[in-house]
Amino acid sequence: MHHSSAPSDNKQHHDAGIQPPRAQAQPPVPPRAQSRPLDPPRSFHGDSFADPFQWLRCADDPAVIDLVEKENAWADHVTAPLHALSDTLVSEFKAHTVETDVTVPIRIGQYWYFDRTAEGSQYVSHQRVPVTLVNDESPAHVDAAPLAPPTIHADRPAPGEETVIDENAQAAGEEFFSVGEWAPSPDGTRVAWLKDTSGDERYTLVVTDIASGRTVDEKVTNVGYGVAWSADSASVLYTRVDDAWRACQVWLHVVGEDPAHDRRLLDEPDERFEVYFEQARDPNWVVITSASTSTSEVWLWPTLQPHHMPVSVTGRRPGVLVSAEPAGDHLLLIHTADSREGSLAIAPLPQVRDEGGAAESVDYSTWHTLIEADSQGPRLLDVEAYESMCVISMRRDGQTWLDYMTRTAPTTPEAAAASARQHRPDYAQIWSEPRAVLPGAHDNGAVLTMNTVGQLDWHDRLILVECQSITQPPRTVAVDPRDGSAHVLREKAVPGWDAEQRAGYVEERVWVTARDGHTRIPVTLVHRRDAACDGRAAGWLYGYGSYEISNDPEFSVLRLPAIQRGVVFALAHIRGGGEMGRWWYEDGRREVKTHTFTDFIDVGRFLVDAGWVAPHRLIAEGRSAGGLLMGAVTNMAPDLFRVILAGVPFVDALTSILDPSLPLTVGEWEEWGNPIEDREIYTVMKSYSPYENVADGVEYPAIMASTSINDTRVLFGEPLKWVQRLRQATAGNTTAAGRASELGSAAVTTTFAGQSDPTERPIIMRTQMVAGHRGPSGRYGHWASRAEEFAFALSQVGINE
């Protein structure tokens, strides 16, 4: 703790130029929390644990907040020598960014919508221009789409341009600001959007008049994700969350009326399930889904008949995941009933009934399979339906793929009505055979992430695809499904990273054999073209590995400074993620969750053993569930990593999953298992939960944990407990000063108060006091936060400028 000298009231001393005596300044020390063993101990399956730091989970305890503030002060002290490097990194982020920019417009109804950013502004402004009918092939009415989006210039407004939501104006006076989702009304006069000013992701529903910018409704609070309109532009659909932050209900709010009169459309009582919805591209429907990790059910709600209840179109079958997309006169479904990697099926539309809601008896014999994946892939993920085509998202060989099919029979209202009446509509000749959207995208081992850009208009005729990688800035490509031709609409400009400069780097896919001798782990590796595998370079290994989320290679200007300094960057596509398909995910969760951690360690050892990275110069990073990964590998292989960046880390996993009252816990039991009822799951989680496996007397890597006080997903008490346990375990250790010679000025072995928490391998925690799971809002706040983390990591591997 710093002790500053007290100001003097003695004027005579000042007049005489004599300074009052100063108290001896004491060097700051790492904060240490009092150990308060839990009484009675936590006891399950014959195992007891008197947790000494469980009290740190109490966010209402002033002593806990005081400790958080002291942790921030200690982080300030440790990172103070790194300010110059942090400032340099921010300058480089800025230099690589075109700050005044626009996005490719997306059509919704009668307008093209796009975002603007401006130099000096923290947030985006959502804009629009009216649709201009310039395509001679289109009939002269508003539903006819031009062949391609218009060109919008960053330096001047477009004719007829107007502001939909200016986030900078809305954020004025707020320490934190985030727009969760937004949707314009069908008549184009209003926009409904979700506002968060604390970071806890409990939103307020706002409705704004676009022409005047006036807020016309801001009465509905405690809202979850999702916003959609009725066809008459009078009512808005939203979700409500319960005390455990589970979106469990869908409600309909009439704009301008008292929320007490809102109508509940759907209630999900099963705590394992969470509801969400989206406006279908077919404007007649909103698609509502209730899903757990392994099971889901889909309803359709008719926007033209807002007084009707949603109707179930899939039923609920345990272990079967399903998604549904209205395709005009029928449904397209992705489901796992026949293959865990998914099947694409076609089915009749439902008949809308006033009572709706209840899970009807679905006749699965009317589902006709169009595409079925085998047990090892490809993994079918999603289908997007339009008036004349559909696009299928999938994974194959560890990478993203897109296929499309075109309609061979037109969509008509008569056909839609017939589909709803028939049990077995004639599915023959409705769709063409699937074709690749960009057939050569992955030729010669190219690493590329392809995704559709979120087109929302039923009448769109082009497929817009965004292609990117770690070294390739996002490129938006328009594909004409009539002949498969493609042309580039826009490539994101990145100053200081043009094609010639990118040519100096290699981005490749390598395969690492796991310790079991047969599992092949895909890794995306980026390095200088002239890099030598001589065991001297610094390395940066990033991982996630949970929830079947794929950690795909995507571009970020924030990575460029490290790569340009010669750091070898690697993405480990480990089990528990979805990179290789559903089976890859299943082989890294519940009873076999440790595969996630051993895969990451095996990739790290490959980087060192192959000479890509020097021993003691490997950075590891992960966030959220990837933070659990960081905590686990820190315990399992502390000698492998020089420094750990753990963002909002889920490091007290067993404690959280044992408490059903906490946000998300019950729904997480399908992901991790239920340790309350299952002894084996308890034992497995006990074996890897990071906080409970910190060992005394171990030389751990330098660690920076980052969190936010209002994070709902991973409570800040988790990293707080973890950091305190690490300090407790390492107190009194001695660290070899000789390591300083390996890293030059990066290592300083000064110790404070007799502890081994030296600047050489500090353990620090940075807490954002007004933010949520994603950290500070606004791009400059985000840059500053990440620059501090990156400077901490780079300095630990000998990169100080």
PLM features: residue spans?
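Hydrophobic beta-strand positions that form the internal "hydrophobic ladder"
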Residues: W112, G188-A192, V236-L237, V286, ...
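Asp-box/WD-like beta-propeller blade repeats and closely related beta-sheet repeat scaffolds
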Residues: A158-E181, A192-R240, A244-W251, H261-D267
